[in-house]
A protein has these predicted regions:
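Aromatic-anchored segments of alpha-helical transmembrane domains
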Residues: 15-25, 86, 157-169, 182-185, ...
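Membrane-interfacial, low-structure loops and terminal tails that flank and connect transmembrane helices
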Residues: 53-71, 190-213
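Membrane-water interface signatures at transmembrane helix termini and the short loops
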Residues: 124-186, 243
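Alpha-helical transmembrane segments of multi-pass integral membrane proteins
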Residues: 35, 39-46, 67-92, 219-227
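Extracytosolic and intramembrane catalytic regions of membrane-associated proteins
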Residues: 245-322
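Membrane-interface helix caps and helix-loop-helix hairpins in membrane proteins
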Residues: 23-33, 120-123, 163-172
Length: 322
């Protein structure tokens, strides 16, 4: 995909394979995996191979110096949705007024050199909580304006490097630091392409891409309507989203809570009793996540019911101790 070799086929294969692996086990769900799936899906429709690619070198497509702004803006909008809804999710009593879970997390990082002593103070957790909320809700807008964009990007880099040191959560920080360069002016990207072209002695045949198909425009509008509605679906569901977790996933609720627990299941059918060893059915990661998430507990109980009926239990009653 990065080299632009058989781009359309490559990005479709990447999107399908990455998303399949991501969705195969819900206990491995991470917001940045979901983000990568969404961006790779959008890239299926974008002419990302029309400049500085092997497809251009092979003559499969002609190089273009300009594309429609809609193809740039869809990536900007997707990034903005991630940040904005992550910030909106932080506007809750526990995050704002209790500084949790940051108070808990930061207290475990006091051993770090240079910054560890600052993390000892309770006020630090409140500063981090408020800044994190304000950063997420406002940074897309500061990045979108030319005057504030350079300063906003510096804040993006500092923010994600800091969170990367304190909370290493995989590739998320790197993805966001690199991804937000899409807000840079076109002249910056042109300079980068020109220097790389000279370095690799890459010759470009320049043309201008035509208008974006109306079908693309309609699709993007529908796509982002769904992207806005999905994070809000919890409003239509009963109960507290932090307890039930209904509507929690796919909603950009990034690092909002800390849960830990254990649960043991008991099967009874008349005089027959059995205590379930969770590890016989689940990996350590699956058992850890299942123990604290209601929908996974219910799913595992339904699995156990089928499992023990297959073993001869006629009417298994399943209870839990947690």
């Amino acid at each position: 995909v990065a080299l632009g070799y058989k781009y359309r086929l490559s990005i479709v294969v990447f999107f399908l394979s990455f998303t399949y692996i991501e969705l195969m086990d819900k206990t491995t769900y991470l917001n940045h995996y979901y983000f990568i799936s969404l961006v790779s899906f959008l890239l299926v429709f974008l002419p990302a191979h029309r400049n500085f690619s092997l497809d251009v070198s092979r003559g499969v497509v002609t190089s273009t110096s300009k594309i429609q702004v809609i193809y740039i803006n869809v990536i900007k909008l997707q990034l903005g949705i991630v940040y904005f809804f992550a910030g909106i999710a932080k506007i809750n009593y526990v995050w704002i007024f209790n500084a949790q879970p940051l108070k808990l997390w930061l207290s475990s990082k006091v051993h770090l050199p240079i910054i560890g002593w600052v993390l000892r103070y309770k006020v630090t957790a409140y500063i981090f909580s408020w800044f994190g909320m304000l950063f997420d809700t406002t940074i897309p807008f500061f990045l979108a304006f030319k005057r504030t964009m350079p300063y906003a990007y510096i804040v993006v880099v500092i923010f994600h490097l800091t969170t990367g040191v304190l909370f290493p959560i995989g590739v998320f920080q790197l993805v966001m630091i690199l991804g937000t360069t899409i807000f840079f002016p076109a002249s910056f990207h042109e300079k980068v392409i020109n220097r790389l072209s000279n370095l690799f002695r890459y010759s470009r045949r320049i043309s201008v891409l035509g208008n974006a198909p109306k079908t693309h425009m309609i699709f993007f509008v529908a796509f982002f309507c769904v992207q806005v509605l999905i994070p809000l679906r919890y409003l239509m569901m009963p109960g507290n989203v932090f307890w039930s977790e209904q509507g929690y996933r796919f909603s950009w609720r990034v690092m909002l809570m800390e849960k830990a627990g254990d649960i043991t299941f008991f099967i009874q059918d008349g005089d027959r009793k059995h205590m379930v060893a969770n590890y016989e059915y689940l990996t350590p990661q699956q058992e850890k996540m299942m123990s604290t998430q209601p929908d996974m507990i219910l799913q595992f109980v339904r699995f156990l019911e089928k499992e023990f009926k297959a073993k001869g239990f006629e009417d298994p009653k399943i209870t839990a101790r947690s």
